[in-house]
Amino acid sequence: MTNIRKTHPLLKIVNHSLIDLPAPSNISAWWNFGSLLGLCLMIQVLTGLFLAMHYTSDTATAFSSVTHICRDVNYGWLIRYLHANGASMFFICLYMHVGRGIYYGSYTYLETWNIGIILLFTVMATAFMGYVLPWGQMSFWGATVITNLLSAIPYIGTTLVEWIWGGFSVDKATLTRFFAFHFILPFIIAALVMIHLLFLHETGSNNPSGIPSDSDKIPFHPYYTIKDLLGFLMLILLLMLLVLFSPDLLGDPDNYTPANPLNTPPHIKPEWYFLFAYAILRSIPNKLGGVLALVMSILILAIIPLLHMSKQRSMMFRPISQVLFWILVADLLTLTWIGGQPVEHPFITIGQVASILYFSIILILMPLASLIENKILKW
């Protein structure tokens, strides 16, 4: 009798995705982040569901409902901080996952890559709207500043912003709709993840060498199931360390002050995972230019496959590109730091230099390095 996992219509899909899937024998720990993102999404959906049972999306009670969750609900503090810090873990894994894709040339799987970019935008939108829900000072002013950016769109900008707000300022209507969107988007993300995996399984995984691995495949289970499990344990350990020892380490103290439209916080800044994009936005003195640069800082990922000039797929054997890649990483860390600093000298200049460098590396220097490396191959 054939095994049920190979014949049952539903189990067959699971089998082909997680058990009998042929995987390259040499994929490193950098390939763990996909499954870690799946774990993060599950943690976020579960903790979010339990938070939604106690949260009220009304301006008068939103802040106190979050306080109520932390004080009166059984393990409410744990659920709340798992959700808040789970978002940070989510973005750490996301950036590592994208970085891996750039380093090892995984972007040549165009469909998978493009769905991934859509996923990145969706997750960022979800995180932004989630940050508004506790209705603290930074929630309110973050929502005001970021939604206001849309007013830079010529002709329809102002109308668009008021349409999103549901009024003439961030208020009751805004909070309610943000809660609705924040609730529905993770399920859309889950659907997109399925499509992402569907496209990935059409081609199979890439591997560190960037060479086709058809001649050397191993079954996903038990080799990569146990490897993923180790990754899960490490992620959960890190998350629990964060939640149980310093849950507010990555948060903003201003968000423990209830939202007040009459009092602007001295430094309006988003959560740490958006700071690099925020720094790019602020480094351009023009509003529309800043918004375009902000969008392009992420959308540039879609252009990366077109700029692939190298004869090799992976950067594993390309030292010049490797150096540029790690300069890019350092540049992003610099932008993250600048995004959290006040708008004054010398931070303005550092931010502008880092922003120019960010686009230069991706658009000019990396393709040039690839061409030089191609030449070196012939020597």
Swiss-Prot record:
UniProt: heme b b562 binding residues: 83, 182
UniProt remark on cofactor binding: Binds 2 heme b groups non-covalently.
Topology in the lipid bilayer: Multi-pass membrane protein
Location (main, coarse): mitochondrion
Required co-factors: heme b
Amino acids binding a ubiquinone: 201
Annotated residues for binding of heme b b566: 97, 196
MF terms in GO: metal ion binding; ubiquinol-cytochrome-c reductase activity
Pfam family, one: Cytochrom_B_C
Family: Belongs to the cytochrome b family.
UniProt KW keywords: Electron transport, Heme, Iron, Membrane, Metal-binding, Mitochondrion, Mitochondrion inner membrane, Respiratory chain, Transmembrane, Transmembrane helix, Transport, Ubiquinone
Subunit structure: The cytochrome bc1 complex contains 11 subunits: 3 respiratory subunits (MT-CYB, CYC1 and UQCRFS1), 2 core proteins (UQCRC1 and UQCRC2) and 6 low-molecular weight proteins (UQCRH/QCR6, UQCRB/QCR7, UQCRQ/QCR8, UQCR10/QCR9, UQCR11/QCR10 and a cleavage product of UQCRFS1). This cytochrome bc1 complex then forms a dimer.
GO cellular component annotations of the record: mitochondrial inner membrane; respiratory chain complex III
Protein name: Cytochrome b
GO biological process: mitochondrial electron transport, ubiquinol to cytochrome c
Any further remark recorded for this protein: Heme 1 (or BL or b562) is low-potential and absorbs at about 562 nm, and heme 2 (or BH or b566) is high-potential and absorbs at about 566 nm.
TM region(s), chain numbering: 33-53, 77-98, 113-133, 178-198, 226-246, 288-308, 320-340, 347-367
InterPro entries: Cyt_b/b6_C, Cyt_b/b6_C_sf, Cyt_b/b6_N, Cytb/b6-like_sf, Cytochrome_b, Cytochrome_b_C_euk/bac, Cytochrome_b_N_euk/bac, Di-haem_cyt_TM
Localisation per UniProt entry: Mitochondrion inner membrane
Function per UniProt: Component of the ubiquinol-cytochrome c reductase complex (complex III or cytochrome b-c1 complex) that is part of the mitochondrial respiratory chain. The b-c1 complex mediates electron transfer from ubiquinol to cytochrome c. Contributes to the generation of a proton gradient across the mitochondrial membrane that is then used for ATP synthesis.
Disulfide bond annotation, renumbered to this chain: none
